[in-house]
C-alpha cells in the first residue's frame, strides 16, 4: 500500500532528481527500493522522461513489475536497471511495458538474470529500436545469445555487452554467423568460457563485419 507519507517522500526525490528540461530522471543510488518504485508509478505526475536511471536501488522482481506495468513512461528511450536484483521473475514482465517500442538502450547488468530471463528479453519483438543491450554479469548462458542471433527485432543493435554471462564457444559459433546483428559495432565477450575456436569463429565471420571494438580478455584464449 502506498501511503501519503511515501508519496510525499518520492515526490521530493523526483523534484531533486528530475532534470530541468524534464527529459531525465536520475535516481541512481537513491536506494528507493520496491516500495519507492511503487510510489513513483502511483504519483499523478505525467512524465516526459526519455532517460530513467534506477541503477543501485535495491530493486527486486516486485519493483520491476511495478515499473513494467506502469503507464507513465511511454516516451522512455533509455532505461538503466543495473546493480539490482530483479531476477528472471522480474524481467519476464518486461514485454508488458508500454515504452518498449521507443527504447534504444536497456542496461540490465548485475541483476541475477539467468537463462529464462534472458530468453524473455530476446524474444520480445517490441524492441525494434534498441541499439544498446547490456547483459553484463548475468548468467544467461548460450541459449538466449543463440536466440538473439536470429531475432529480427534486434537488427538495429549497435552495442552488445555479454561480459561474464556464462557464454561458451557454442554460443559464439552461432553469434558469428548472425545475419541479424550485422550492425553491431561494439561486442564485449570478456570473462566467458571461450577458447581459441571462439576467436577463430569471429575472425572468419562473414556477417559481423562492422565490429570496431571486440573485447575478449580474461578468457581461455591465449596471447
Placement of each model-derived feature along the sequence:
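Leucine-rich repeat
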Residues: 6-15, 17-23, 34-42, 45-51, 61-69, 71-78, 88-96, 98-105, ...
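Intrinsically disordered/low-complexity terminal segments and short unstructured peptides
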Residues: 2-4, 29, 42, 164, ...
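Concave beta-strand-loop units of leucine-rich repeat
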Residues: 25-31, 54-58, 81-85, 108-112, ...
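Glutamate identity and glutamate-enriched acidic tracts
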Residues: 8, 20-26, 35-38, 50, ...
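N-terminal segments that cap or nucleate solenoid repeat domains
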Residues: 1-58
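Charged low-complexity stretches with an acidic bias
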Residues: 65-85
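Solenoidal tandem-repeat scaffolds enriched in leucines and small polar residues
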Residues: 104-186, 190-191, 196
Amino acid at each position: 500500500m502506498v501511503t501519503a507519507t511515501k508519496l510525499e517522500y518520492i515526490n521530493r526525490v523526483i523534484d531533486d532528481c528530475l532534470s530541468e528540461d524534464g527529459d531525465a530522471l536520475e535516481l541512481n543510488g537513491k536506494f528507493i527500493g520496491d516500495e519507492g518504485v511503487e510510489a513513483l508509478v502511483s504519483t499523478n505526475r505525467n512524465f516526459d522522461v526519455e532517460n530513467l536511471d534506477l541503477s543501485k536501488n535495491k530493486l527486486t522482481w516486485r519493483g520491476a513489475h511495478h515499473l513494467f506495468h506502469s503507464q507513465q513512461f511511454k516516451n522512455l528511450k533509455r532505461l538503466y536497471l543495473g546493480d539490482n536484483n530483479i531476477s528472471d521473475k522480474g524481467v519476464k514482465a518486461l514485454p508488458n511495458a508500454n515504452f518498449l517500442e521507443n527504447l534504444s538502450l536497456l542496461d540490465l547488468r548485475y541483476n541475477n538474470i539467468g537463462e529464462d530471463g534472458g530468453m524473455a528479453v530476446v524474444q520480445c519483438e517490441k524492441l525494434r529500436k534498441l541499439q544498446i543491450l547490456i547483459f553484463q554479469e548475468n548468467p544467461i548462458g548460450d541459449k538466449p545469445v543463440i536466440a538473439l542471433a536470429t531475432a529480427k527485432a534486434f537488427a538495429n543493435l549497435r552495442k552488445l555487452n555479454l561480459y561474464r554471462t556464462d557464454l561458451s564457444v557454442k554460443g559464439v559459433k552461432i553469434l558469428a554467423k548472425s545475419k541479424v546483428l550485422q550492425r553491431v559495432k561494439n561486442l564485449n565477450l570478456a570473462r566467458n568460457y571461450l577458447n581459441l575456436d571462439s576467436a577463430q569463429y569471429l575472425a572468419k565471420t562473414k556477417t559481423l563485419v562492422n565490429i570496431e571494438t571486440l573485447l575478449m580478455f580474461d578468457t581461455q584464449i591465449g596471447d
